[in-house]
Amino acid sequence: MIDILPAFWAVIPAAGVGARMAADRPKQYLELAGQTLLEHSLDCFLGHPALKGVVVSIAEDDPYWPGLRCASDPRIHCAAGGRERADSVLNALLVLHAQGAADSDWVLVHDAARPNLARSDLDKLLSELADDPVGGLLAVPARDTLKRADSHGRVSATVDRSTIWQAYTPQMFRLGALHRALAECLVSDVVVTDEASAIEWSGQAPRLVEGRSDNIKVTRPEDLEWLRQRWAGKR
């Protein structure tokens, strides 16, 4: 690990609808401890001295973003949300280029509904990847026994978990390399669910940096309830 952390840009794709939450609004705008999930997800970056700027990708008809206090922060720029996550991130990278970012600059992509990122995890990621030739991501080793299912919903095998990790965010890559990888995936109709997948498809191996298991992504109602109870206990 190094003492001087590298400067970085952050990208938050926030154009999704979060259908599994069955809420009255996209999940990134649900409330947690007086702020939206998106605001909490931004806070860890906005409070970091090495931040150069943030791009948030939002849906064209998003009625919620303009009402957030952080929407007027001069460090935050907006990009058009796309049909898929990869489209939204690629649009954000184009905005970074327009802001003068270089291909060699580090970009950290973070989920809009992952509000519990610890500053210590962010610093660890920046420190451990500062000189890495590829980049990498926060991740957590699998803890539970994993089962592979057949087409009838029955167990077909028990998976060796010793080499299995859960991919978290932020995911940290050089701007130019990430731009090329995502663009190539879109042209080739390759479906990627995170930025590391695109880098992998380009033939590179991202590094896994172990983070905290409580850096969860809110996907279902019980995730948000768990965070509310946890945060209430901190007060």
Curated annotation (Swiss-Prot):
It is an enzyme of class 2 (transferase). One of its GO terms (biological process) is isopentenyl diphosphate biosynthetic process, methylerythritol 4-phosphate pathway. Pathway: Isoprenoid biosynthesis; isopentenyl diphosphate biosynthesis via DXP pathway; isopentenyl diphosphate from 1-deoxy-D-xylulose 5-phosphate: step 2/6. It catalyses: 2-C-methyl-D-erythritol 4-phosphate + CTP + H(+) = 4-CDP-2-C-methyl-D-erythritol + diphosphate. It holds the Pfam family IspD. Its EC number is 2.7.7.60. Keywords: Isoprene biosynthesis, Nucleotidyltransferase, Transferase. The record marks 161, 217 as: Positions MEP for the nucleophilic attack. GO terms for molecular function: 2-C-methyl-D-erythritol 4-phosphate cytidylyltransferase activity. PROSITE patterns: ISPD. InterPro entries: IspD, IspD/TarI, IspD/TarI_cytidylyltransf_bact, ISPD_synthase_CS, Nucleotide-diphossugar_trans. The record marks 20, 27 as: Transition state stabilizer. Catalyzes the formation of 4-diphosphocytidyl-2-C-methyl-D-erythritol from CTP and 2-C-methyl-D-erythritol 4-phosphate (MEP). PANTHER family: 2-C-METHYL-D-ERYTHRITOL 4-PHOSPHATE CYTIDYLYLTRANSFERASE, CHLOROPLASTIC (PTHR32125:SF4). Belongs to the IspD/TarI cytidylyltransferase family. IspD subfamily. This is 2-C-methyl-D-erythritol 4-phosphate cytidylyltransferase. It comes from Pseudomonas putida (strain ATCC 47054 / DSM 6125 / CFBP 8728 / NCIMB 11950 / KT2440). The gene is ispD.
